[in-house]
């Protein structure tokens, strides 16, 4: 008999809670995503996260301890050697990653692009982080006139290649992306995903077509999600979760346009009758505010998210468990534009916790979440991680 019929796992992308013990190795001494945002905002207003025990993990401006938190609380340390989205999420589901994925806030190295040009016979333009629509406005006409390839990246570990379908036929674009995929498996580059981004139209009126194709990496081993799916449990992936795991172990995928859309979708899954895992990633914190070093926007987004939690609390049943965490930090007042190596919060709540919660021991790996989910549903335990299921008292 499962202790919980449904587990709702929410990853607040990049919401770190202070430098990790090994932060110095990553150039991240002093990083503190929530703490610095709270300072910048002169106090964060997150009453619902506070009720769950956020301030009991650590007090910050506007975020204080409560005498009787509703849930269990602690923080988790990442064991893997990266600080990117894929590494964090893969570890959450029971894997240990010793080769970090790379992000390219300054664009890709010249030697990689030289090799790509040589192997494809086409010049490369762009080579910077950009929004897909903006880069077409900027370089689409040049791409059409010259037959070159627009290469760009984003805040994540991706290499995207855009070309007009009438200039570079789809088959050729896909071949080019396969070449890029091979080149970027090298540990120096280690790109999580290569994406073909074909477009059509005329200058000033370009549109991306549905012929996008992703060349992703599958997780380097079986995750708890694979075990759940193979045991006929539901695994509902919301937001970019399905992409992060390349669809592995996913039974249903719900795309989202924003954090608020993500919260709408999680409320939708709360209304569904299923047995298994609902897994949500809220990417806006990271993509719109962390990388752009916008502490004000980040703080407002955190408060907006917090204001949606009562809808979740209201619909949670006695045999549901809500787990809230993050996958890495991205301190918007830290130098540079990259993620930061931080502890992440962990909050666990169920309406069945009548006595409220208490502090859990510090987690030595994000994989403790995967182990807890696996133990709850009686599936094969991951190689890494220690379950805290029995510490959650009803």
Curated annotation (Swiss-Prot):
Mn(2+) 2 binds at residues 286, 291, 339. It is an enzyme of class 5 (isomerase). GO terms for cellular component: cytosol. It catalyses: 2-deoxy-alpha-D-ribose 1-phosphate = 2-deoxy-D-ribose 5-phosphate; alpha-D-ribose 1-phosphate = D-ribose 5-phosphate. Pathway: Carbohydrate degradation; 2-deoxy-D-ribose 1-phosphate degradation; D-glyceraldehyde 3-phosphate and acetaldehyde from 2-deoxy-alpha-D-ribose 1-phosphate: step 1/2. CDD domains: PPM (cd16009). Its EC number is 5.4.2.7. Mn(2+) 1 binds at residues 13, 327-328. One of its GO terms (molecular function) is phosphopentomutase activity. GO terms for biological process: 2-deoxyribose 1-phosphate catabolic process; 5-phosphoribose 1-diphosphate biosynthetic process; metabolic compound salvage; nucleotide metabolic process. Keywords: Cytoplasm, Isomerase, Manganese, Metal-binding. Pfam families: Metalloenzyme. It is found in: Cytoplasm. Binds 2 manganese ions. Its cofactor is Mn(2+). Belongs to the phosphopentomutase family. Isomerase that catalyzes the conversion of deoxy-ribose 1-phosphate (dRib-1-P) and ribose 1-phosphate (Rib-1-P) to deoxy-ribose 5-phosphate (dRib-5-P) and ribose 5-phosphate (Rib-5-P), respectively. This is Phosphopentomutase. It comes from Bacillus anthracis. The lineage of its organism: Bacteria, Bacillati, Bacillota, Bacilli, Bacillales.
């Amino acid at each position: 008999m499962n202790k919980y019929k449904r587990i709702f796992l929410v990853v607040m992308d990049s919401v770190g809670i202070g430098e990790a013990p090994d932060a110095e190795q990553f150039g991240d001494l002093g990083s503190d995503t929530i703490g610095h945002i709270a300072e910048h905002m002169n106090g964060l207003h997150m009453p619902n996260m506070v009720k769950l025990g956020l301030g009991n993990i650590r007090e910050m401006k506007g975020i204080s301890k409560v005498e009787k938190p509703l849930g269990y609380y602690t923080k988790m340390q990442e064991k893997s050697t990266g600080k990117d989205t894929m590494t964090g999420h893969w570890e959450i589901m029971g894997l240990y990653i010793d080769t970090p994925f790379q992000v390219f806030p300054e664009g890709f190295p010249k030697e990689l692009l030289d090799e790509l040009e040589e192997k494809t016979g086409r010049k490369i333009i762009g080579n910077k982080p950009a929004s897909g629509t903006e880069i077409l406005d900027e370089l689409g006409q040049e791409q059409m006139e010259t037959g070159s390839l627009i290469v760009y990246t984003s805040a994540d570990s991706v290499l995207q290649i855009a070309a007009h379908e009438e200039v570079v036929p789809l088959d050729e674009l896909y071949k080019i992306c396969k070449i890029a995929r091979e080149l970027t498996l090298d540990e120096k580059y280690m790109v999580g995903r290569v994406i073909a981004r074909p477009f059509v139209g005329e200058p000033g009126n370009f549109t991306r077509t549905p012929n996008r194709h992703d060349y992703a990496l599958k997780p380097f081993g079986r995750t708890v999600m694979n075990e759940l799916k193979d045991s006929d449990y539901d695994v509902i992936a919301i937001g970019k979760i399905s992409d992060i795991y390349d669809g592995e172990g996913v039974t249903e995928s719900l795309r989202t346009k924003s954090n608020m859309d993500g919260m709408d979708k999680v409320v939708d899954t709360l209304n569904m009758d299923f047995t298994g895992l609902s897994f949500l990633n809220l990417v806006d914190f990271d993509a719109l505010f962390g990388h752009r070093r916008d502490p004000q926007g980040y703080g407002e987004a955190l408060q907006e998210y917090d204001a949606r939690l009562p809808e979740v609390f209201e619909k949670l049943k006695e045999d549901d468990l809500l787990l809230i965490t993050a996958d890495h930090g991205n301190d918007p007042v830290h130098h540079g534009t990259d993620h930061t190596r931080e502890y992440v919060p962990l909050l666990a709540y169920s309406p069945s916790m009548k006595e409220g919660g208490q502090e859990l021991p510090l987690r030595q790996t994000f994989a403790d979440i995967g182990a807890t989910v696996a133990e709850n549903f009686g599936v094969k335990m991951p190689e890494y991680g220690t379950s805290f299921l029995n510490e959650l008292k009803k």
